[in-house]
């Protein structure tokens, strides 16, 4: 299992099931979220696949957040008004099966989140992980200045402050919000 969260609010979990026995093994894999419970369809790379969706309002009702979740070869399953993604998998003797689940929290104000959701849903496991790592490393190479200081503790503090500025900045420039200027709020995002 390899998990990552892309900077555009897209969470990806890649899985490889390996069967070391001499017989095929059949299992059912399920993925669910309290945020995405309505079944639907999404087109990924020209092919239709099952998707779960849901909506919720942001604090103070500033925008609507759309939860979207899909997985390779998954179908919707339900019971008592609750829905999840399910997939029957047969892992061949001595073989492996790969698949992934992708979930995103999208808004109309951040169209890149929808673009990245569809992009990662269409990539294979290895391609998805490689793409995320390359983009993550490039992001830091472009945004973290190189400052040479003799003490590692000072370097760590500098790196931390730059990380803090990049990931705890709030730019809430959406209609109806009174404070529409970027601000740094330490600790607000975790």
Model-based region annotation:
Residues 1-85, 89, 116-134:
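Polysaccharide-binding surfaces and accessory modules of carbohydrate-active proteins
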Residues 3, 32, 55-57, 102-106, ...:
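Structured loops at beta-to-helix junctions and adjacent beta-edge loops in soluble globular domains
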Residues 8-10, 94, 147, 154:
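Active-site-proximal structural scaffolding
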Residues 113:
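Short, surface-exposed ligand- or partner-binding patches at beta-edge/loop junctions that are enriched
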């Amino acid at each position: 299992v390899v998990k990552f969260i892309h900077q555009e609010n897209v969470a990806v979990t890649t899985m490889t099931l390996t069967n070391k026995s001499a017989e095929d093994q059949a299992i059912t894999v399920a993925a669910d979220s309290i945020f995405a419970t309505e079944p639907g369809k999404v087109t990924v790379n020209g092919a239709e696949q099952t998707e779960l969706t849901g909506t919720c309002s942001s604090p103070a009702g500033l925008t609507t957040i759309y939860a979207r979740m899909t997985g390779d070869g998954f179908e919707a399953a339900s019971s008592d008004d609750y829905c999840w993604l399910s997939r029957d998998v047969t892992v061949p003797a001595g073989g492996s099966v790969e698949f992934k689940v992708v979930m995103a929290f999208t808004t109309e104000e951040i169209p890149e989140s929808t673009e990245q959701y569809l992009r990662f849903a269409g990539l294979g496991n290895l391609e998805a992980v490689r793409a995320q790592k390359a983009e993550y490393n490039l992001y830091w190479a472009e945004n973290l200045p190189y400052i040479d200081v003799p003490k590692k503790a000072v370097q760590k503090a500098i790196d931390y402050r730059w990380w803090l500025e990049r990931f705890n900045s709030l730019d809430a420039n959406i209609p109806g919000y009174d404070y529409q200027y970027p601000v740094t709020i330490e600790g607000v995002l975790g």
